[in-house]
Amino acid sequence: MENKLISFGDKAIDFTYQTPYGKTSTLKEKVQKADKTFLIFLRYYGCTICQLDIRAYRENYQKFLDKDAQILLVLQSAPATIAESITEEELRFEVACDPEGKLYDLYQVGAARSKLGLASIKIGRAH
């Protein structure tokens, strides 16, 4: 597989993934299930910041479904780590487990360079 930086609207590079619940699928199969697919990369299921993002996606997932959209969330965590912590029904959307970071490499998703790099640009601004 070639590594390629993609932009909004580009055709995504297909890959095979395993969910925390023992299913194997491909991105190509997944995108056929809805009009729009949001491919989201977070790091580890145990990361507090990632947990906040996951909770927000779970709480707002019906809004995605209402627009014929879906989420495929890539986490650099082992399937068992996630399956032991949350059920498939509670999660609501599909997770692609990538403990070796191969998908992060494929899509050139690097780590944050600093703690500040993890924060939203909105942090610290008056609302």
Regions found by a protein language model. Name each.
Residues 1-29, 52:
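N-terminal "domain-start" segment that seeds a small globular fold
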Residues 5-8, 31-32, 40, 64, ...:
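Generic structural signal for beta-strand residues in well-ordered domains
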Residues 53-105:
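Structural microenvironment flanking redox-active thiols in thiol-disulfide oxidoreductases
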Residues 93, 98-125:
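Thiol/selenol-based redox catalytic cores and closely related redox-interacting motifs
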